Amino acid sequence: MERDILHCDMNNFFASVECRLNPELKKYPVAVCGSVEERHGIVLAKNELAKAHGVKTAETVASAKSKCRGLVIVPPHFEEYLKYSRLARKIYERYTDLIEPFGMDECWLDISGTRRLFGAPEKVADEIRCTVKEELGLTISVGVSFNKVFAKLGSDMKKPDAVTVIPRETFREKIWNLPLSDMIGAGRATTAKLNDYGIYTLGELAQCDAQWITKVLGKNGYMLRCYANGTDNSQVMPADFSMPAKSVGHGVTTTADITRCEDAKPLLLELAQDIGKRLTLQNKYATKVCVNARSSILRNREWQTELPTATRSPMIIADTAYRLFCDNYDWVNPVRSLTVTAFSLVDGGAVIQNSFFNDTIRLEKMEKADGCIRDIRKRFGEGMIKNAVLLTGLAVPKSKAVVSLPGNMLNK
């Protein structure tokens, strides 16, 4: 049976929600931007009026203002974005339960086998587009095709407030003249490498030799060639599906540069506490840790090591990360941001080989203490109990948000 796949993309999502909350903003070019004071001062989203002035996502606020003097800057309100994301998903659920989120503003829908019930897929796509506009006051672009890659490509081809169909019979005429960068999976480095070999369009990618591109780009190159030829068989996964975690990480850009090892200690503990909490929720233990340091000149350095024992203890993770960082960072430049990642995870029920503690009693005590701390925070709030080292003027942004969304591209 031919598959009917939709890709729904909410147009200029953050900026559109802000204009929905404050209709006066619709008259002006608007950009949703991170905090300059907390050094997150980049454009997260912009409306069509700002886009017409050349404002681009991910550029600095200063750059955006230089292009558009009347640009209205608004801070992000992630709770509202999540609210509207969920409301849109409720609309999609009227047609199928196979809905795979791809970020807050995008979803794939598999409506295969529903033609007798709802009509042709392009009709369903247009109904969804109109319903979102009427009920939520937001516009979406919908791509319709026989696989996920082409459905997403379709939603990108015509914006805002549009439906684009890429049928199996004519997909070559529709998409083979498009640049490589238009297709999911073809990032800057991949595109640049293929450009060096004279491959610029999806058609040229589709027609290149399979063995050659595998040699040049590995499995990813072969996969991209398959995508360009319309042979993407990845399934639309339900919203509650999630791949087993291979790692758990957290990073932050500080409000002021770190200039000494000692100043990194409370920050690493703060990151480790988040990691420990998430490992506990997933019933996982980590056996290795990785630290990534980004300098003030935006140069990244990364190191990894084994943990002294399989653990989810924030103190053990933080202590190992601290020693790893201090032993390796050269301090030619101050540090702008740090990321800690715990990986090589094992299940909580697995037998843990204790190589650091001479007895398990101390480990059990630490984990019980960690559990008590988590319980207190869950019951009374995150700020009710802290490690003393976190009271030393930690230069961490006041606002932190972690958004976890399911969704995977799986070939079966």
Question: What is each residue range found by the language model?
Answer:
Residues 43-44, 163-164, 300-304, 351-353:
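Short, well-ordered strand-loop elements centered on a beta-strand within folded domains, enriched
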Residues 13, 36-39, 296-300, 345-349:
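Short, charged/polar surface micro-motifs in flexible loops or helix N-caps
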Residues 108-113, 302-306, 352-358:
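Short, hydrophobic beta-strand segments
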Residues 316, 322-379:
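C-terminal hydrophobic structural anchor segments
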Residues 146-149, 227-230, 285-296, 335-346, ...:
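A glycine-rich phosphate-binding loop feature that marks nucleotide/adenosyl-phosphate handling sites
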Residues 1-226, 236-239, 277, 360-412:
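Gly/Gly-Pro- and Ser/Thr-rich, intrinsically disordered tail segments characteristic of DNA damage-repair
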Residues 7, 182, 190-335:
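DNA-contacting surface of Y-family translesion DNA polymerases
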Residues 26-28, 69, 138, 285-287, ...:
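A generic structural signal for short beta-strands and their flanking turns/coil linkers
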